Amino acid sequence: MKLFECQNCGQLLYFENTKCESCGMRLGYLPAREAVTALKALGDPPGRPQRFRAMAEPRAQYRFCANAEHNVCNWLVRADSPNLFCEACQHNRTIPDLSIAGNRIHWRKIEFAKHRLFYTLLKLRLPHKTKLDDPQDGLAFDFLSADAPHPHGSGTPVMTG
């Protein structure tokens, strides 16, 4: 995995960082630039999604993926995009029940691994269509628990693969 650098102060950054430990700048991952980037808030009014200028790509405006609200994603989406979710989170079909204690922590670990997978898929320019884009061959993630009912009603045990 590539190491990154804060565009504001030069501090070493890691893929999952959301804040620079040196200068305090908010950070986000910009898939199109393959960069963790320092962000400058645009000062949106309350109730609207916060928009940012990415120091790695200052001409465009960005916002965080909707899953950033749960502290499980640091990827950016163009502010004018109709998608609420980033390229990686668009593939989530089922997420854990967040009302169950501990599920948010488990989901975060799974999301970090999934985001590393998508980093690699994008880097290698491999196809990664969603099930909505391609119902037959698209990719979808169902993050299930053996303790919760199966969301598709099949009653089959939870398995990986």
Predicted regions and their residues:
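Short Cys/His-rich micro-motifs in 6-15 aa windows
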Residues: 24-34, 88-98
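A short Gly-Trp-Pro
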Residues: 27, 32-68, 157-161
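Fold-level signature of zinc-dependent metallopeptidase catalytic domains
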Residues: 84, 94-95, 99-110
